[in-house]
């Protein structure tokens, strides 16, 4: 399918990337923790999701945020499903206390130099 790559924003033929792969791939699918990436961002480029630990970490952070907001999970509930926490305590506090001025739906967080992800 053609569409906009989640990472680079280019209009390309897209591939589905499971944010949490391996043994956690089925649960990643169950909770909609997938993104559509162009082949470069998915597997070809040195900075792609499958070749760069930094890119994988960025997507893990996005996936945890998405799961915690959509499922209304605590950090502990996320860890029970996915085995690890990827967010810092301030981000977790904001998710777990949505009525305290944190806008989970439209907040943009600077994750890396110049990279904005919608979560």
Task: Please tell me what each predicted stretch does.
Residues 1-15, 40:
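Short cysteine-rich loop/turn motifs with clustered Cys
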């Amino acid at each position: 399918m053609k569409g906009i790559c989640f990472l680079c924003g280019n209009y390309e033929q897209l591939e589905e990337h499971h944010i949490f792969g391996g043994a956690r791939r089925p649960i990643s699918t169950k909770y909609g923790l997938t993104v559509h990436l162009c082949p470069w961002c998915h597997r070809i480029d040195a900075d792609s999701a499958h070749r760069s630990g930094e890119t994988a970490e960025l997507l893990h952070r996005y996936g945890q945020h998405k799961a915690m907001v959509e499922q209304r999970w605590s950090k502990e509930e996320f860890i029970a499903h996915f085995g690890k926490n990827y967010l810092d305590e301030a981000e977790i506090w904001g998710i777990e206390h949505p009525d305290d001025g944190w806008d989970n739906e439209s907040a943009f967080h600077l994750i890396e130099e110049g990279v904005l992800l919608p979560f």
